Amino acid sequence: MYLSIDVTSLPSISSSIYKNESSSTASTLSGKSIGRSEQYVSPDAEASSKYMLSKSPEDIGPSDSASNDPLTSFSIRSNAVKTNADAGVSMDSSVQSRPSSNVGCDQVDFSFNKGIKVNANLDSSISVSTNSRKEKSKNDHKSRKHYPRIEAESDSDDYVLDDSDSDDGKCKNCKYKRKYFALRMRMKQVAMQLIEDL
């Protein structure tokens, strides 16, 4: 498996120390505002929609006037996930999550300018050899002997036992040969009769 990651532009990290002096404290990164100043709802429809679109989806609650409107709620959520790829993505921290004391703390912002490119290639090959199996099957065919087929209706005198079945040709003209063929013919007739009856 081949995995390559293009990290030509790692996230640029900037650290800043701030103190919670007022609720309108903000630091900017790539033209975006990280902190938010407090806004108030006005009766104007345009100002109200701007207010709702500026809030994050988690901050919208029952007290907001447009939170129960499905279209406005969908618009707010879809606007919340839109980002500008050229300007970068900033990790936003809300004012409420900052400590209330005057103790300074570090704030770290991440900006991904080019992103991460991942290429994964999976190469596999399977080879199966069947040479030994073919040779074995050829040997099986060689070891099998083909005997003459005797039909039930045929004359047994026309068939002579093969030399390989006898002991050095001692039973070539055996006295039991005729009885053997007669018995075999009767057994075949019985078998054929059983097959027909079934």
UniProtKB/Swiss-Prot annotation:
Residues 153-166 have a biased composition (Acidic residues). One of its GO terms (molecular function) is RNA binding. The keyword Magnesium applies. It holds the Pfam family Rota_NS26. Its main location: host cell. InterPro entries: Rotavirus_A/C_NSP5. GO terms for cellular component: host cell cytoplasm. Residues 17-72, 127-167 are annotated as: Disordered. Transmembrane segments: none annotated. The keyword Magnesium applies. It is found in: Host cytoplasm. Its cofactor is Mg(2+). Residues 17-33 have a biased composition (Low complexity). O-glycosylated. The modification Phosphoserine is found at S67, S154, S156, S164, S166. Belongs to the rotavirus NSP5 family. Homodimer. Interacts with VP1. Interacts with VP2. Interacts with NSP2; this interaction leads to up-regulation of NSP5 hyperphosphorylation and formation of virus factories. Interacts with NSP6. Participates in the selective exclusion of host proteins from stress granules (SG) and P bodies (PB). Also participates in the sequestration of these remodeled organelles in viral factories. This is Non-structural protein 5. The lineage of its organism: Viruses, Riboviria, Orthornavirae, Duplornaviricota, Resentoviricetes.
